[in-house]
Every structure is written in structure tokens, then in C-alpha cells.
Amino acid sequence: MTLAADGVAQLRGEFPALQRLEGGRTLAFLDGPGGTQVPRRVIDEVSDYYLSSNANSGGAFATSDASDRIVVEARAAVADLLGADTPDEVKFGANMTSLTFHVSRSIAATLRPGDEILVTGLDHEANVSPWLAVAKDRGLTVRTVGPRLDDCTLDLDDFDAKLSPRTRLVAFGWASNAVGTINPVAELVRRAHEAGALTYVDAVHWAPHGQIDVRQIDTDFLVCSAYKFFGPHVGILYGRAEVLERLPAYKVRPAHDRFETGTLNFEGIAGTHAAIDYLADIGRRFGATQGSKRVQGAFMDRRLALRAGMTAIREYEMGLYRRLAEGIAALPGARLWGINDPDRFSERTPTAALTLAGMSPRAAATALGRIGIATWDGDFYAQGLIERLGLSEEGGVLRLGIVHYNTESEIDRLLAALEDLARGGVARAAAG
């Protein structure tokens, strides 16, 4: 059994927000790259924390013990999701951006003027601006690897040209939140390590779409955000144990953890654990087979279940994306940015960046929103890429993001609406 329409219908029943009506129709959430909806179990865990366990950590009483236990158990769940060696390599924070500013400061304290940091022109600013800030403070040099504009992939020749013996850290994304390009993560890590550099991978956009194994890709750091994979607003940092141990930490003196500042978001962390268990349950219910036997059932190891679940999600989502891409290709005046060759769809996520002739992305998103279809428009903090594509003055792109709770009928509904907008935009452009 794989994830298909009937299974998705069952899963959709676990998401209260997916039952919301707009104009007599359910709201179609095609805004996943900006944040996902959450299943009931996540809501219940957040609520239950306030109802029965609301206390700070470290106390000698039951509710404080419960808060401590929530964090310990959630670290283990995240370690399973990311493939970490130990839960101690998992750190929680307000969001990926805050965690990256924190870690960038710690790493920069070990560097000297003239040392170099490599970033990319495909990335979200949260994995660019922190490195620019510490470079300014410390007299470091930041080099930017450019994208190939024909397919919005990373220019690997430029990567090699800018990687040098002076490079101390390479920061890049697993996948582009703007156009969906998947980078060759393990290969980039290998090249960076051969040059003697640390690696810092932004997996925020990738996390809801496929497997993560920090040991397999061999990265030193990886960050993601639970609200992108059906959880609350919690930032997550993986750091290789031996690297974390040698970094200076910026913290209050009595704090026992070196990279978690202040009181943690216990309710959000409880919800994050629930979101990971939800993904593991997808693996148990709809996961792939191993050899001749199905790896399925209540007793499946969580790490194995997560791999099976993310594999099932990836296969289902990309089936929907093919349907969407084929439909967009037939629209008059429409342009899909990024990898468009169906034979290369394995190199992308199910996120479409679109422009329509004669209509701004904001106008298109507004029109879709009025008929109950949620999308995003703009640059999504991937300013460098949108500028290089020459789309900033036009308002960026219209972004359509598929996740596993979306359906074929929602894709068809979206395509019908886009066709109306495209034909109207072409007519306006011709008249103008």
C-alpha cells in the first residue's frame, strides 16, 4: 500500500483547518512553503501542556518534571527525524533564523580576518544575512556562489572556483524555498570538507518533502523549522557533537545548555514531537516495502517509519507536481521558473514559481485568494535569486506549494483558476 487518494483523504481528516469553508468550498492550502497546517494531535499536545504540565524546567515537582520529560522525548524524536547519532546533537530555538544568528556568532569567534565564508545566490536570507553580519564584525570575506539562471540550479563550477583554502564555512540550502531546486547536498558537503571548511545546511524547505540523514550527508550543522513540517513554530538545530563542543557559546553564565537560551517553548516542543510521530505513522500506514515484506505496523521503529513515511510523501507529492507542471505548461503567457524538464523532477521539490503575462504576482495571488485558493507571492526572502532573475520590480513570482495533504481535485481547481487568470492577463497585455 502506498500513499494515494484514499489514504490522503484519511490523513486530511486529521487536519481541522482543512475543513474550513470559503464561499461554500473548502479552502485549498497551496501555501505550504510558507508554513503548513497541523494535525489534531499537534493541537492536542500543545493544549495538553497548558492544561496539565505548564511549568518551567528544573523544579522538584511533577509539572516541572513533565516539562523536562517533554524536551528529552522531543530531542529523541528530532534525532530520529534527522538521523542524528544522539539526541544531545539536537537544539531548540525560537526559529531557524535566530538559531543561525546564534551559531554564526559562535563560529565567527573562532575565525580571523581574511578567513572566508561561502554562501549561495539560491538561499533564503536567513542563511545569508547572519554570515554577512559576522563577517562585517570580524573582518571576514563572504563569497557568493551564483545560480544558473536557465534552470535556477547552483553553478557548481562557480562553487569550485570560489571554494579555497581560506574558506572556513560553507552555508547553503538543501532546497530553494523560492523555485524548488534541490541541491546535491552530500556532494557539496564533501567538497567543502575537502577544502577544510565546516558546512551549514538550511533544510527548512526540504523537511516536509523528503528524508534527512545528517550522517549520510555528513554535514556539521543543519537547521529546520517545525512549522514547515506540520508542527508549531519551533526552530531546530542539529550540530555535530565534536563541533559543538569546541565552539564558544554566547549564553548566561548559569545556563546548563550552551546553545539554548532562556526558557524553552515547551508547548511548541511537545507539538513538534507530535508532528514527527504523525510523519512516522504515515510510514507505518503507507510505507514502502523492504525486500519481500512490508515494513508496516505499530511496532515499526520510529526512525525506519520516518524514512518510509517521507518516501511515501515524496512519491505522492511529485505525482501531483507533474499534474500541476503539465497544466501550467499549457497556459498562455505563463512561465514556470526553475527545473522544467520532467526527466529532472527528482532534482526539485513540488514547489512552483510562476509568472503570468499581464498580471503581477500579487494580483494573481489576490484573485486566487478570493476564490479560496491560498498561495504566496513575492521573493520569500530569496532576494538574491529573484533579483538575478530580473523579477524584483515585477513583484517576484507567484509560488504554488504542494504538500501531502493536497489533492488532485485541488490541483485541477487551481489550474482552472490559473487558466482564467492567464487568458485575462494575455488579453490585457495585448490591449496595452
List the predicted regions and their residue ranges.
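Pyridoxal 5′-phosphate
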Residues: 1-432
